[in-house]
């Protein structure tokens, strides 16, 4: 088990698995609050925001980027969190490949000179959460800007070789499996019976 036994996260996870109620309050290194108590500052200071649904993830990413951080450009910016969405086994740094679910931040200052191929690609430097710098990555801007319902088609397009990334202020719990974060926020959502145990 990754979390220490006295961890509030372990305690809360155990209660959730057993179907026991979870009340608002502090649990050692974790706290449970209502959605209306979540502040912009809490969201800004979190390493990641975990959501159960893509729709919520997209909403939170847009909220963080446009409303809280006031980022106006349609392109990723310096220090902005991204997550890789398609494996590229040909790119490796320190034994780590650029794979689906790899999260990190943009480490260069992308400008107009980094955009190419009719505004469909952008060159970025990507620093993953393990401190591995992937330099000069050709990012697929068409995929990055596409609505969720078009992304799967773009991912499977054999003619588009650029690497697929999405915003990652918030990610789904599915993509976070195996990851560790010091300061995360989990947004509880109703899931269909066939998803929950």
Give the positions of each predicted feature.
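Conserved interdomain hinge at the start of the Helicase C-terminal
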Residues: 32-45
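Core RecA-like ATPase module of SF1/SF2 helicases and allied nucleic-acid translocases
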Residues: 4-7, 48-197
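Residues that form generic nucleotide/phosphate-binding pockets
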Residues: 12-16, 41, 63
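Conserved coupling/interface region of RecA-like P-loop/ASCE motor cores
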Residues: 1-35
